[in-house]
Regions:
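N-terminal alpha/beta PP-like core and its mobile active-site loop of ThDP/TPP-dependent enzymes
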Residues: 1-97
Length: 97
């Protein structure tokens, strides 16, 4: 019997609670997560070349659909590059995860 990983439980939880749109910047630290999202039929994902673009796309997604998007990136500098986009969401009171 293959047991589910914590990240699989987390992604399933998000999808079950209508957080089904993901904005991704791939990297070594999140390859298993991206792979799992890619295998989920219920999930929609968009890949970006820069973390700030992914965060701003999540902001635009909320503005146009009213649904909160999920931004995923790799650790280290990748996470740091999210700050401008996340701060923009915070200043505009736009929810993002």
């Amino acid at each position: 019997m293959v047991e589910k990983k914590v990240l699989e439980h987390l992604i399933d939880y998000l999808i079950d609670n209508r957080f089904d749109t993901f904005f991704l910047v791939t990297g070594g630290a999140i390859v298993p997560t991206v792979d799992y999202i890619g295998r989920k039929k219920e999930a929609t994902y968009y890949c970006f070349q820069h973390e700030q673009s992914a965060a701003m796309a999540a902001e635009s997604f909320y503005r146009t659909s009213g649904k909160m998007g999920v931004v995923l990136t790799t650790s280290g500098p990748g996470a740091q590059n999210l700050l401008n986009g996340i701060c923009g969401c915070w200043y505009e009171s736009i929810p993002c995860l």
